[in-house]
């Protein structure tokens, strides 16, 4: 079942890189008691994700936070080491938390898995943006095609705040 507006996010675990190495963070750690702008991408460093989606998030990050959003998170079905390298390479280290969903646990639990095996990428996440308030989905923008950023970018979510 695909998650929809009004649904509570299911319990899942992410990995986030810290100075001590990868640390487990739960859905509650990330979303409980907070308003979070969540952006999902099919893969770190992939063309559309790196050249289009990520810039749309960072160009709008301050404005999104100015509208009362506590934090911005970016999730991908990648490991914590790849997500940390991607975060470091963006030079936007403090604007967003990069969440590794390495086994697609969260992605599958919300029904957003994408089979990209035909491109040698295995199971990935659909591209979407989501506004989550205290663990409840308030806005959801699912991209109709993985190679485009038409409704899932930072500008769209900003316009909905």
Question: What would you call each of these model-derived segments?
Answer:
Residues 1-161:
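Chalcogenol-based redox active-site neighborhoods
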């Amino acid at each position: 079942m695909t998650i929809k507006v009004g649904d509570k996010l299911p319990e899942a675990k992410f990995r986030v890189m810290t100075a001590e190495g990868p640390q487990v963070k739960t859905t509650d750690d990330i979303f409980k008691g907070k308003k979070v702008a969540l952006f999902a991408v099919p893969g770190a460093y992939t063309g559309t994700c790196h050249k289009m989606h990520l810039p749309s998030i960072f160009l709008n990050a301050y404005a999104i936070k100015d509208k009362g959003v506590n934090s911005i998170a970016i999730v991908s079905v990648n490991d914590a080491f790849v997500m940390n390298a991607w975060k470091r390479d963006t030079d936007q280290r403090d604007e967003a938390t990069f969440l590794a969903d390495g086994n697609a646990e969260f992605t599958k639990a919300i029904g957003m898995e994408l089979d990209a095996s035909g491109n040698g990428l295995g199971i990935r996440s659909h591209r979407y943006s989501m506004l989550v308030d205290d663990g409840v989905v308030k806005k959801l923008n699912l991209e109709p095609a993985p190679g485009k950023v038409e409704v899932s970018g930072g500008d769209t979510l900003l316009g909905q705040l």
